Amino acid sequence: MKLKKTIASHLMTFLITCSLYSQENLGSWNILNATLKINSKWSAFGETQLRSLSFYDDFHYYEVKAGGTYKISKNFSATTGFGSYNTYSEGGNFENPIQNKEIRTWIQINMKNPLEFLTFEHRYRAEQRFTNNGYKNRFRYRLGAQIPINNKTIEAKTFYVSLWNELFFTNKEPYFERTRLFVGCGYEFNNNVAVQTGYIYQFDYKINDEIGRDFMNIALLYNFDLTKEEKEYIPKTSD
C-alpha cells in the first residue's frame, strides 16, 4: 500500500506540473467511451474523440468509431472495429482545407498479465486505412499497466493509476511513424461509470520534420452489462 501511495503522489505532482504548462503548447484530448457487455464472451463498444492543439482552442481533429470484442479466455481476447477519422488544418477551429479524411478498419489481439498489485496489458493492432491520400497499412503495439490505489483490484470507489506507451509502424520507409505516451489516473464510481485524466505526449516522426505534441487528456467511460454478473470492470479507452 505504501508503494501504491508513493506512485500516486509522484503521478499527481507530474500531472499538476503538466497542467501549469503553457496553454499555447498544451492541447486537449477528450474521449467519450461506452462498452456494452452482451454475454460472457461478446462485448461491443463505441467511442468518440475531440482534440485541439491549444488548451480547448484550435480544434483540429475528431473521430467516431465502433467495434466488438470476443473473449477467448480470461486474459486473452480479439477485437475488430471501424471508424471515421478527420484531421483539419492548423491555425483555427476545424480550419479548412481538411488535411486527412479517413475510414479505418482494424483487427486486434489483447493480452493481460495480472500480477500482485498491477495488471500489464499488451495490445497488437493491424490497421487498414482508406485516406484521401490513398490506402495505407499501419501496425501498433501498446504496453500498458493499471495499478489500483485504495483497493486490491479496480472496483467500485477505486482510485487507480494508468500508464501506457504505444509504438506505430508502417510497411513503408522509414517504417517507424509515431510513439504515444500516457501517464494518468482515474476513479471508478461503480461498475458502470469511470473518469480518467492524464498527460499524453505524441511524437510524430518525419524524415525532415520531427514533431512532438503535448495534450491534457480527459476521458469519461461507461460500461453497460446485460449479464448483471457484477464482475470487475477495467476502465479503458479503445484508442
Q: Where do the language-model regions lie?
A:
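Sequence/structural signature of outer-membrane beta-barrel proteins
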Residues: 49-55, 83-94, 127-132, 166-172, ...
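Residues that define the transmembrane beta-barrel architecture of outer-membrane proteins
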Residues: 26-28, 60-62, 101-105, 135-141, ...
